[in-house]
């Protein structure tokens, strides 16, 4: 795992087309902004895991949203 330190307003690049910018820090929460092409899916981990679980269940939702 690559570990980076960024300050508010600073950006990191993932490949040539994805940028992640630190928008703010408040306590133990960090607000980030992600710019990516339409064809690149961007999800919070818990949402991604739910999507993967639903794919495994034949697309049937298995929990509350």
UniProtKB/Swiss-Prot annotation:
Assigned keywords, A-Z: Activator, Cytoplasm, Repressor, RNA-binding, Translation regulation
GO molecular-function terms, A-Z: mRNA 5'-UTR binding
Recorded superkingdom: Bacteria
Biological process, per Gene Ontology: mRNA catabolic process; negative regulation of translational initiation; positive regulation of translational initiation; regulation of carbohydrate metabolic process
CC annotations in GO: cytosol
Location in the cell: Cytoplasm
Sections of the chain in a coiled coil: none
InterPro entries reported for this sequence: CsrA, CsrA_sf
Function in brief: A key translational regulator that binds mRNA to regulate translation initiation and/or mRNA stability. Mediates global changes in gene expression, shifting from rapid growth to stress survival by linking envelope stress, the stringent response and the catabolite repression systems. Usually binds in the 5'-UTR; binding at or near the Shine-Dalgarno sequence prevents ribosome-binding, repressing translation, binding elsewhere in the 5'-UTR can activate translation and/or stabilize the mRNA. Its function is antagonized by small RNA(s).
Family membership: Belongs to the CsrA/RsmA family.
NCBIfam families, per the entry: csrA, PRK01712.1
Assembly information from the UniProt record: Homodimer; the beta-strands of each monomer intercalate to form a hydrophobic core, while the alpha-helices form wings that extend away from the core.
Name listed for the protein in its UniProt record: Translational regulator CsrA
Naturally occurring in which organism (per UniProt): Vibrio cholerae serotype O1 (strain ATCC 39315 / El Tor Inaba N16961)
């Amino acid at each position: 795992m690559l570990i980076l330190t960024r300050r508010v307003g600073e950006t990191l690049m993932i490949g040539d087309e994805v940028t992640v910018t630190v928008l703010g820090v408040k306590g133990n929460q960090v607000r980030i902004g992600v710019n990516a092409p339409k064809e690149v899916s961007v999800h919070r981990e818990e949402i991604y895991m739910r999507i993967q679980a639903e794919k495994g269940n034949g697309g049937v939702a298995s929990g509350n949203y």
